[in-house]
């Protein structure tokens, strides 16, 4: 391709090398509309397409968020009710989603398959430019908001997918703080508004304004298209021009007015806590400030380094001073860089409003004359550069988003994907006062801080519900008649329950089974014995990064000790000082030597076993080949020489408990599933005791009784070290490292013998359990055991998720998310941010009948579900994930013959197979286990449920 030449209406303006991606950047402009299109040419066979619109909110109704959901519900060319879901069901997509940001809406897709890639791009282009929203108001009512009413005598309810999603978001402490920070930092431009929508304001959005907003902003002149990978660029340009851009004239483009940095001001908001929680020390105090402009990439990276060194660990100087003063339980920071004017936040967790001035005094004292250690700066830069260079997936999407960080605001699109020179510049600044100046720009500029104080309230949820109810009554009082709203609701339900016709289904692009790779992806792993140790050897990473995983069996450890070991492994190892390193020095050394280091627990269940599992403590590490010896030595230091000092352990414990509290509100479905699955398999029990509600209850009890339990806890930890880290329990996994490098490590382990590897944990027994949390929505988790495993259950679960549950739980019931999962241990279902958990649980009883009805559909429908299922089984993975997958297969005794046989079983599946599967599902659901995590109103409606609690 040649610069200044025209390609299907696009002029090629510039071609530049992108060495960091081993590729080139091609920049095009569409002549007729001035639309911008860039192609990041790489050898990546996973091809990515995204189209982005600059969408600038003008109120809190969440109109752009609702549009993001709505345009994917049918279009001029693709006439089914939900083409987005059809693609999830039937394509070979490796990424398929849409995202609303404070100033843009992004529609990305990717696929390894050329035909599929063009199909995905076509559906998305038609969705954004020719959506069915203009002819079908039901889409707005379903995805946005509506009055739900069936009888003139009843009080209506608000319902809608986005409305319920945002009720869940508004239950999150951090979301509330960030929304208020946006309001206070940017009072003069569009960033002041909640782009996702405030639940109080969403019902203010009219259908007419919704359509008007789409017409105004969804135009090629306001679009940025990015392609990434080994794309047939001329075919793509021809398609985009002929099918879409050529039909438009030049339209409006939009700019964001820069916000003047204003004098300091303080705002107070309320955050919800559970009725049984004490409000003492449950406030949050956050300081925020605008930091320059989007094009100051060096400053953004430098500020991240400054924050990391000052508050990144409990022994970082500023965080340590605040913790030791007792002014807060935790200190965190955030950099919001995907904005025209980035900003930074320093957040103090679990504090009191009255501590505000003392906190400022501590910040002044620590930062006034602080000078950064050159070695610590070097380590931080090295660590950040390692993460930048290590390929993450989905790489094409990440490249696109990084490029948009500058390009969206008419900056240079190459800046966000070519950062090597910036890391070199930062190294040169180590010997100057640059980092101290960056510190002062934020920490010593109180006169421009926005301070947000979030105070706990036990009544805000009740007041919020009462306000919504009062509004509904007021709205109803102003109606001349309820009949139009009842008819609107009935029409919506009729549309939701009407299956797509054959004519509608035929409009969707389709693949055939012949397009699917019949062979499974292999993860070559050689298993040998070295110095009496089981060693798994993987091929070297082409990038030159080396990886090692260490596994120590936890067999023989009583079930009641699992939570203790999980806390020890996940929160203490690597987060405490050691005999030879202070925590700050250890953190610096980790960044320098092992930029990727994680410690925790995991388990591997032998093939076709549910009664037992193999539990392990695991250490995962990635580094450069030149640092291998230092990395191994550092891991030894962490495992055997960590100093378990009472005060520092307590700080980590409190922070862990706060994290779990927030996770229960934000991701309650994960905890519901963990609990439910603990009733069906030994693996489920292990995960519940190491990550679930039981784990949370253990940590809370340990904090509540810390003084009296400390000596016993410390003794148990020391005993764990002497028992767990033994040669007999050790398995080594390596990629790109000689096994001999670990000889000293192996001989440094103790010689305590282990008894077996498979553990049979007793299953939980209660069929129905519930946990009450604060928040506006609820979550469910259901688990059931299968007598025999058939790989076809994977297809069944895929179908049920994207057809039956999507329609019944998300579309009709208004839950933000739902799904069914199946593996060798059984199957489970869940709902997420669910306004009516009882309804969602009842839906499960209809799965078997739905499957029997599915048999009446054409065989091609079954083929499409097989295609979609296989796509989900082969996600994009970076090399580190490939190594971990290889370990999992070996340690679960699943060889390539088993995997290939299962693939062939899937490809041979016929729709009649659903009849036998339906019978098994129906029988299994008779003995299901249900868990609900929800607010007070939802839990109070449950009958026959055992009440759970994190607290004693």
Regions found by a protein language model. Give the residues of each.
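Generic recognition of flexible, low-complexity loop/linker segments
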Residues: 95, 211-215, 272-275, 332-336, ...
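Hydrophobic, small-residue-rich alpha-helical packing segments that form membrane-like cores
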Residues: 149-222, 226-244, 248-274, 279-281, ...
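M16 family metallopeptidases and their MPP-like homologs
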Residues: 46-56, 82-130, 136-148, 175-200, ...
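Extended, domain-scale alpha-helical bundle/helix-rich regions
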Residues: 430-470
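Non-catalytic, conformational "gating/processing" segments within enzyme and secreted inhibitor domains
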Residues: 159, 211-243, 691-692, 713-746
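Active-site recognition of the HExxH zinc-binding catalytic motif
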Residues: 61-73, 562, 566-570
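His/Glu-based metal-binding/catalytic segments typifying zinc-dependent metallopeptidases
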Residues: 41-43, 50-52, 163, 167, ...
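Non-catalytic terminal extensions that flank enzyme cores
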Residues: 1-48
